[in-house]
Amino acid sequence: MGERATSGEPPAEPELSIVLAVLNEGATLPELFARLRGLALPPWEAIVADDGSTDGSREYVRGLAATDPRVRLLLHDGRQTTLTAQCQAIASARGRSVVVMDADLQHPPELLPRFVEQLDAGASLVIASRYVPGGTPGPRPPLRAVISRGAEWTAKVLLPAARPVTDPVSGFFAFRRTAFVPLDRGTRGYKLLLFLLVMCRGRPIREVPFRFEPRLEGASKVTSGLAFVRVYLVELLLARRLSRRLRRRPEGPPVARGVVT
């Protein structure tokens, strides 16, 4: 599977790298970038990992990258999982801090300044949680709600690093790049946060509330229930294996959860 990067020259020293795994998000990308530009953020870059879009997403980002050097596009010749695309984008990130979020506007970009604030205050990982006061999972189809809650419960049973947090399967979070441990090549899945919880165990972790917004455009990229469960269980086993690899790391301060208001 090939990978190509297209962009103008990126900023000399971005402090924040925003990772966006994209598949057919052409309807929401213009608004997302307009909202990002309106935020009070440190110098940033956006790395868009396109996983085979056919709706004009990659053409839009390519045009954006030609005029805005903060934007970079990673193109993949074949379909891969969200986790794989995110890890490849993180490998090319240049900022000291990394934000991982969806491009469909269900993750409000206005939360990014709070992420930066908490990272600057010493957190290694900041999680946008639907389950701390002030957060909400929003309206969901019953089957998706059952799968999501089941995934959270299973993570806490099988992965000790997931137990101190309220939303271990959130897809919206930020972390210090120095905390990231590259995963084995070929690791597939959907929930990068499971691995980051292992990587950051014993380091300061914060949770901030967010409202999971209804999807305004396009279709959900969540795979079918049975396929998700199969891949997710493999992810949990791989995260447990990573935990064993890192178990000799000295323990730091206890995990702390906080709500930013």
Q: At which residue positions do the language-model features occur?
A:
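A conserved acidic beta->alpha catalytic loop
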Residues: 50-59, 105
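Hydrophobic helical membrane-anchoring modules
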Residues: 1-16, 158-163, 185-261
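Acidic helix N-cap motif at the loop->helix transition within catalytic regions
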Residues: 27-31, 55-64
